Amino acid sequence: MKQEEGPPLEPNLHPLEKSSWPSGAFKSFVRLLFKHFIKRPLEGFLSFLLRMSPALYTELDYGVFLPFIARMPVAWGRSLAKARGRLYAKWGRDWRNFSFGDVVHLRTRQVIEELRAEWTPEERARIFQARFEHQSLEEYEAACLHQGVTRSWPVQFEGLDGVMSAMAHQKRLVLVTSHFSSSILGTAFLGQLGFPVLGMSSNVVDRKEVPASVSRTYRRKYKAMGTYLNGGEILDREGNTPRFVRFLKKGGVVVIVGDLPPEPNESPRFANFLGRKRGFAQGAQRLSDMLDAPLMSFVCQYRDGQHWVRFSAPGEDPYAFISAQIEKDLGQWWAMDVLGAYPVEVSTQAPSDEGQVGQVGVSAEASAKAQSKGSA
């Protein structure tokens, strides 16, 4: 019988060359010290501060902490932003909760349970945590835009041929994006293509309920993004439709944040999205139809030390493309709590040759709430 080989022999090292602390045990010891003497006391203090003075907490968080980590090396800044997001996941908080008392965390859990019903509770908890991490990363990137450090960040583009072809032939393009990963920052990166870009924001951040430090963070982000856009700018969607139309007539790229539900009295733009036919606001489609501009979409994600902007293919449904990206990385969709506000199109009769369908939508109240308190 062949003798089994034993483990490889340890090299004949001098006793002083052998670590008296096995690396695994040492790391565990350091993590234990950090958890009990730094992490827990710090979390307790921040939780106490938030309860005692929410205004002071948000001022320190948005007005001091985010600008501070924006000046750090990217790896450090992203790590601290994710840690901030994990803390917010633990508390079930984000800026909408600070501002409106909105129960974003409860709707988020409901969406995860709907879309990942077959997953274990631990796997769903990881998605929940990732959602808050990525919203925190988006706010970190907002601070980085204001600091001007994003100009040196490397960017790669995928699927660019369709975009360049559309601009060469029709001189105008409507792009849909979403509250997913780094896609808002991706709007600024589009300026590198050389075309004027007009992006969409929302005046929800100016409401009186929103802490001043939060409003400043988002307004500074929008202003900083405008410097990337080759003469374009970021405009609030509320009340500025004529300016979007005039800009597109002249020629350029208009970016619409498209993962918003329709207004209560608006006819939805339906698309296959996360397993069902769901209805969205019509703004992007209406602009495209009005000016015969191609309608495409993009997402932006951070991977392997750089950002990647990925475009849909010509002729591909732009919302279905976004759906496919979200499906692969659900935790990066930090507006997933709006899923329940999308009207759902379902069959109201037996299938026929005409394929007629009926609409079963959410209530006008739910849609209005999502619009008024939606992500910026």
Q: PLM features: what roles do these ranges have?
A:
Residues 2-177, 182, 219-224, 366:
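Membrane-anchoring hydrophobic helices of lipid-metabolizing enzymes
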Residues 104, 182, 217-219, 240, ...:
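Residue-level preference for nonpolar/small residues embedded in alpha-helices
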Residues 140-144, 183-185, 207-209, 263-266, ...:
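Short catalytic/ligand-binding loop motif for oxyanion handling, primarily in non-cytosolic enzymes
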Residues 146-150, 224-232, 268-273:
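Short, basic, glycine/proline-bearing loop/turn elements
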Residues 163-164, 187-188, 222-227, 244-245, ...:
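Short amphipathic alpha-helical segments and helix-helix/interface helices
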Residues 171-236:
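Catalytic core of membrane glycerolipid acyltransferases/transacylases, capturing the structured
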Residues 192, 236-376:
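Non-catalytic C-terminal accessory region of glycerolipid acyltransferases
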